[in-house]
Amino acid sequence: MQPRTPLVLCVLLSQVLLLTSAEDLDCIPGFQQKVFHINQPAEFIEDQSILNLTFSDCKGNDKLRYEVSSPYFKVNSDGGLVALRNITAVGKTLFVHARTPHAEDMAELVIVGGKDIQGSLQDIFKFARTSPVPRQKRSIVVSPILIPENQRQPFPRDVGKVVDSDRPERSKFRLTGKGVDQEPKGIFRINENTGSVSVTRTLDREVIAVYQLFVETTDVNGKTLEGPVPLEVIVIDQNDNRPIFREGPYIGHVMEGSPTGTTVMRMTAFDADDPATDNALLRYNIRQQTPDKPSPNMFYIDPEKGDIVTVVSPALLDRETLENPKYELIIEAQDMAGLDVGLTGTATATIMIDDKNDHSPKFTKKEFQATVEEGAVGVIVNLTVEDKDDPTTGAWRAAYTIINGNPGQSFEIHTNPQTNEGMLSVVKPLGYEISAFHTLLIKVENEDPLVPDVSYGPSSTATVHITVLDVNEGPVFYPDPMMVTRQENISVGSVLLTVNATDPDSLQHQTIRYSVYKDPAGWLNINPINGTVDTTAVLDRESPFVDNSVYTALFLAIDSGNPPATGTGTLLITLEDVNDNAPFIYPTVAEVCDDAKNLSVVILGASDKDLHPNTDPFKFEIHKQAVPDKVWKISKINNTHALVSLLQNLNKANYNLPIMVTDSGKPPMTNITDLRVQVCSCRNSKVDSNAVGALRFSLPSLLLLSLFSLACL
């Protein structure tokens, strides 16, 4: 039998441990019984046990303290309630408050048959959380009242008592303050005769934790006799609030390859319960990790601080090998310091594994081929690369560079932002006859620098072979534009120049023919064989087809290819002016009053389509063969204007005065124009020719004067 004794002991010990564990799982902090009924004896005997109270904080009751609302009783460490001396009357109710660092609770002892005591209760509710207020010399005796929140019916229920040892007869107690006669009103009341304080409804510590009331005694007329004296009502916290995560969404980032123990983020929950108790003492844990690969425990959370840290090796934090670089953690916060009886709240923490540039881009091929027609520009080939880094970062985005084979800067390469490919383009047309083949060396790098232990290798460079295809190119005029200067009015058939166009396709030995492409005035002809350009009409500098003395024509050069190619050349003919336009005067109508004292008629201006020196100074004259002398006079004002005036008044009539104007060309050209002068009866009005300065008379004023003269017709 002896050999079996250790086995039996082990079995018994395991049963005890299992039972203890089960009890811990079912443990609820506080008094196991909240209300006790005690029959009032003839006398409570000193040190005699009255009843046993059972309190547990589910953590061993370390630093357990008991406090009784009556100074005549105490609770021993074993939970036994005893009297401190012989006493007969203790009132109708006692309260016992138990407290540890982890929990607290209050039990009510109802004295069946007890009577209200008349005497000093100076230490009622002595166990207030704050130090008792020093006793003052007064007859009203009050102590703080402690009331658990969330009490149930019945209400009202007595929670304390106020005593006035020197209270006059017929005096009354009066209670005031927030919770009595101030909002929220009617929570507390006092028996005006006995001083019993009662609560009328359930209290919520998270709404109001402490009520500051005042007690006073009054006479029958309501006049204050003593007081007011402060009365503090403290609401005892119950664990009735779950932890709440209020600051979401919670998103953290950690760089791939980070060392074990790297802090990612902090989770903080809030509990509305009393922070001085375990009701608001939180502990954190990770309930779930998604995905659960490569390890179901990629992260750890500090149970007290809420810091989330990595717990796997840096090799497992490789973004490129993870199925998903995003992890979601269900974080649970539990009050009561994490005991099973604690309330819980959860939140989701999203952790992103951020990329670092630990992979260099690599070309998918060492060599690429491209073809392009000579003369063409644009993209000729897309170079493809592979990069395992995050496509949304500069660790993936490629930057290409031509490092050899581009001395003429005929090529450029840019990155396609969608595909990350290198788009190689021709930006300067290539000539087959110059070079039919080109070889470029291209390198690729990332926008972001590589991490120190990674470098660009041979796969980060590639060769591009480009073949230039021969095409039938159009002939090219040289020079272009072609410029000649000739006098206008040269004789028809005059040779202006011989154009010259060459064929870039020098190896094909093609012939070239010429033709007129654009000749707005129809003045030119070109020999289709030798390119000689001559005139078919008189060249006129004043033609509307001439712009600023320059006439523009276009010619074609067409080769003999199949199909033929065409080139265009521009001819700019600068026409020199000759005096081929006579000047003209303005205005051609004037008026004057028949009784005018000022005999000035009009200021004449002259203009010429030719250029200087074939224009002004102009010479103004009256054609004397057509009009009598001693009636009209013309006087020069400046190079372009003259004043016409009368030598005597004329009768009302219309007069035609021939004006002869001559330019300064060699030979000069003359024009005779009739000036129509209207002599009017102006009544009280008159034309004031002096108002117009001889040198500053403007063309708009002359036109206005001409319009006014029409009124005399």
UniProtKB/Swiss-Prot annotation:
- From the UniProt record, list the residues forming the propeptide: 23-138, 691-713
Q: Which PROSITE patterns match?
A: CADHERIN_1, CADHERIN_2
Question: Which Gene Ontology molecular function entries are recorded, alphabetically?
Answer: beta-catenin binding; cadherin binding; calcium ion binding
Q: Name one GO cellular component term.
A: catenin complex
Domain Cadherin, chain residue ranges per copy: 139-245, 246-363, 364-477, 478-585, 584-690
On the tree of life, the source organism's domain of life is: Eukaryota
What stretch or stretches form a coiled coil here?
Answer: none
Which biological process annotations from GO are given for this protein?
adherens junction organization; calcium-dependent cell-cell adhesion via plasma membrane cell adhesion molecules; cell migration; cell morphogenesis; cell-cell adhesion mediated by cadherin; cell-cell junction assembly; homophilic cell adhesion via plasma membrane adhesion molecules
Q: One matching Pfam family, short form?
A: Cadherin_pro
- Its signal peptide is 1-22
Which cysteines are cross-linked by disulfides?
none
Q: Which Gene3D superfamilies match?
A: Cadherins (2.60.40.60)
Q: Per UniProt, what is the membrane topology?
A: Lipid-anchor; GPI-anchor
Which residues are reported to be glycosylated?
N52, N86, N382, N489, N500, N530, N598, N638, N671
Lipidation, GPI-anchor amidated asparagine type: N690
Let me see what the UniProt entry remarks about domains: Three calcium ions are usually bound at the interface of each cadherin domain and rigidify the connections, imparting a strong curvature to the full-length ectodomain.
Subunit (UniProt): By contrast to classical cadherins, homodimerization in trans is not mediated by cadherin EC1 domain strand-swapping, but instead through a homophilic adhesive interface which joins two elongated EC1-EC2 domains through a region near their Ca2+-binding sites to form a tetrahedral, X-like shape.
The record ties this protein, via PANTHER family, to: CADHERIN-13, CADHERIN-23
Q: What is the stated purpose of this protein?
A: Cadherins are calcium-dependent cell adhesion proteins. They preferentially interact with themselves in a homophilic manner in connecting cells; cadherins may thus contribute to the sorting of heterogeneous cell types. May act as a negative regulator of neural cell growth.
The protein, known as = Cadherin-13
- Please tell me the species this chain comes from: Pongo abelii
